[in-house]
Amino acid sequence: MAWNPAQPAHHTIAPSPRKRRHNVFVIAPRAAEIPGLYVHLLADQHSFEKFSMPDVTLPVVRSFFLFLSRRKMLRRWMETSPLARRLATRFVAGETLEQALDVARRLKSEGITVTLDHLGESVTNLEEASAARDAYLRVLDAQHAAGLECNVSLKLTQFGLDISYDQCFANVEQLVAKAAQFGGFVRVDMESSEYVDRTLKLVRDLHARHGAVGVVIQSYLFRSRADVESLNAAHIRVRLCKGAYLEPATVAFPGKRDVDRNYVDLANLLLDRGVYPALATHDEQMIRQIESYATSHKIARDAFEFQMLYGIRRDLQTRLVADGYRLRLYVPFGRAWYPYYMRRLAERPANVFFILRNLFRS
């Protein structure tokens, strides 16, 4: 039965197949209803607000979007829908490297730097990992040739971490060496908690050899304060974010307030003792707290940078640049935009409302 916008959508409550043992549940529309549901929710913000009810906990909302990120049928529909592609172009620079460079040039003229992310997925063989390495080498070469800062972000599973640590290290080392040659930088994104130890080991080993590499730390993990202190002591640059993966309560704060409180505490620790920290958030209240702390502790505005996602909170981006803060945007590009898109909604469901607002303003 097709979904009727005049009536509430029917939903099924089912355990997430990947996290069943943690008793995490997802709310999912019937498969046949998804296209109509998306179109209607995008057209009617009031309906979406009703759909995202306040009594739905953050882990459930996160699991919902992560569930959608794995739905092949929805992905096929989204990637061929004119409306969905319109949304994607608002938050993804394009499918080609040249489109991403055009965005980077425009942002540079506005006083904003970027880190480019060539979107991809976990690889299943070493040939795919080598192809990902070669694609990123082309990105760094193109940034350098265009007179842009050479700065990229990447996920280790795209370079073979699940297959061979040594081969993953060799692949990423080529990128870090090239970035160092160009005076650039490679940021290693953090994935789910099972990857933290391997990711930190690889970053430490690369940093000891080349220096031009840093890592992401997620404030929703209990272990993150100890990791930040250790990275500060090793003079390794950290990007701080909240975290987007569905984690059990044994390793992560389940509540948003605790995640936010830990974020601010870690941001202050990075401002005090870190090496050019990158503070990634779209939360204006949190940004005000960071600004206040930096001012009261006489921390120069060029000693750290704010980071945001391309296409979100452009009003806040403009304000930060006008106030003399450094700002870098995370600019993704490539054909594999759908999983990225859904992970961003999982990370912060309020991004949905930024998307809706920007869609209807354009």
Descriptions of predicted regions:
Residues 9-10, 24, 31, 50:
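Low-complexity intrinsically disordered segments
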Residues 15, 21-22, 30-34, 38:
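Periodic, rod-like helical contexts
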Residues 8, 20, 36-38, 323, ...:
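Intrinsically disordered, low-complexity segments enriched in small/polar residues
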Residues 51-362:
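Positively charged, amphipathic and often flexible ligand-engagement surfaces
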